[in-house]
């Protein structure tokens, strides 16, 4: 893993890092309010609300301009944010010598638009550790589906030359398992927001990625004990992906998402009784063909 804390690389001098723009769409979409203390960190075309206690992002918000996207090389220079004390962000030590991935929250390509120098800076900014969260490295069908969702968001913006705003974050719960000084989130959410073709109405769609272990009782306790003895990350389960009501994301996270919930395109579907672990109204996704805006 290559990391750098060189400010000339991670934070080019003179560049305006205005962060997320609430007026980016034709309908104003303010940064959702959270009822806990969080550091607001502006980057190029996106903002991270960092929970200094959990040392992870409580929320990320990115503006995507589909008419101005640039295709730049990936790079891999993960770096700490020099504006934040090291003890308030999750650095490389959490990802060393294990099977955890540094999962981008704001996807690398999403803020990479505009003038080349600006797009290049946005590309670098996405490799801040404040924009990462630990995820199970196992690549299965549902994780591929989640990445397919991210691809579709960007493809939609590019094809239709559309502007989108996307909110992404881990769901930070008190009972998340401890590991190397942090707690590993089990769920992640993504909310896409856009306006109708006439520009007059807001529309949203929310998705949830769940990597909770599919164990319980004695089996789960034994798995935790083995991981602790061996110094491994706590057990995580296979990824499951759902489209969910925005109001459920608000309930899980504590964010005020009233405006986004009002614009939710997901309509309730009557069910007899949802399976264990799935709330009523959640739609399990098994194919990219099910993803739509």
Residue ranges and their predicted role:
Residues 1-293:
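Domain-level detector for secreted/extracellular nuclease and nuclease-toxin modules, and
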């Amino acid at each position: 893993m290559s990391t750098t804390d060189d400010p000339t690389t991670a934070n080019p001098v003179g560049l305006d890092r205005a962060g997320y723009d609430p007026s980016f769409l034709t309908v104003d979409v303010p940064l959702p309010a959270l009822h806990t203390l969080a550091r607001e960190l502006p980057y190029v075309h996106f903002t991270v609300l960092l929970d200094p206690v959990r040392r992870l992002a409580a929320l990320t918000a990115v503006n995507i301009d589909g008419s101005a996207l640039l295709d730049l090389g990936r790079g891999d220079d993960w770096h700490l944010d020099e504006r934040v004390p090291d003890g308030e962000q999750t650095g490389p030590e959490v990802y060393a010598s294990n099977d955890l991935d540094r999962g981008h929250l704001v996807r690398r390509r999403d803020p990479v638009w505009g003038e080349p120098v600006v797009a290049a800076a946005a590309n670098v900014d996405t490799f801040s550790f404040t924009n990462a969260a630990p995820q199970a490295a196992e690549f299965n069908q549902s994780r591929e589906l989640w990445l397919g969702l991210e691809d579709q968001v960007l493809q939609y913006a590019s094809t239709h030359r559309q502007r989108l705003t996307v909110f992404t974050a881990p769901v930070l719960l008190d009972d998340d398992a401890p590991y190397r000084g942090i707690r590993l989130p089990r769920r992640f959410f993504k909310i896409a927001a856009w306006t109708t073709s006439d520009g007059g109405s807001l529309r949203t769609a929310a998705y949830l990625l769940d990597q909770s272990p599919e164990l319980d009782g004695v089996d789960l306790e034994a798995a935790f004990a083995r991981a602790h003895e061996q110094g491994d990350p706590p057990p995580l389960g296979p990824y499951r992906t759902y489209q969910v009501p925005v109001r459920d994301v608000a309930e899980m996270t504590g964010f005020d998402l009233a405006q986004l919930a009002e614009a939710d395109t997901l309509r309730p579907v009557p069910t007899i009784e949802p399976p264990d672990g799935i709330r009523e109204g959640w739609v399990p996704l098994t194919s990219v063909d099910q993803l739509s805006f």
